[in-house]
Amino acid sequence: MRIAQKDLAPLLSRITDIRMAVFSSWPYLYDGNLDDEHKYLQHFTHDPESLVVGAFDGEALVGISTASRWETHPENLLSYLPGDWRAVPVTDILYLAESVLYEAYRGFGAGRAFFREREAFALEIGRRYVAFAAVVRDPNDPRRPIGYRDLVPWWRRLGYAPIPNALCEMEWKDHGRDKAHTHHLQVWMKEL
């Protein structure tokens, strides 16, 4: 369900907990900190054309998904779009920033609902495209859990496709590292 901006402030600590828990695992391995998380989430409390969708178990928030205008995302994602994609006006793209859900709640439809809500929101604010960036890791990385289920087939079933040669770069600190380093993410897009 959509979370109204006026209702976000009391949930920010819980949202931060969920993000840090989920992003600490494969494939992100993000070693986050509360200050960076709170700064990042402030955007969603102020931009009327951003969205936070929550998954709840009763009153308990167990997952969130966000979206914001492509042009307001902190990273300059447009610079990573190759060739013809640069002709697409940035005002036509909604960036699907993240979907994070506690593992015990996966496989029951929350992920599909996250995409459905964000796609509907994109159309409501006049966006023709939705895009996200997925971290790229070596499939032979020894940190990859046995039995990890790759989301690529599922994203394709939802109608998303990777944009060839659209690899963006973002920095974050992995668990077990002393400092942040560059990670590559594949941009995926869907026309609505």
Regions found by a protein language model. Give the residues of each.
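A short beta-loop-alpha structural element at the N-terminal edge
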Residues: 1-15
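Helix-loop element at the rim of GNAT/NAT acetyltransferase active sites that forms part
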Residues: 17-32
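Active-site rim helix/loop that mediates acceptor-substrate recognition in acyltransferases
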Residues: 28-57, 66-69
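Short hydrophobic/aromatic beta-strand element in the GNAT-like acyltransferase core
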Residues: 49-54, 64, 98, 185-187
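Conserved acyl-donor/pantetheine-binding loop and adjacent beta-alpha core of acyl/acetyltransferases
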Residues: 64-99, 142-143, 166-179
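Conserved hydrophobic beta-strand within the GNAT/NAT acetyltransferase core sheet
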Residues: 96, 130-133
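Conserved acetyl-CoA-binding loop-helix of GNAT-fold acetyltransferases
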Residues: 98-101, 107-124
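Conserved active-site alpha-helix within GNAT-family acetyltransferase domains
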Residues: 123-128, 136-165
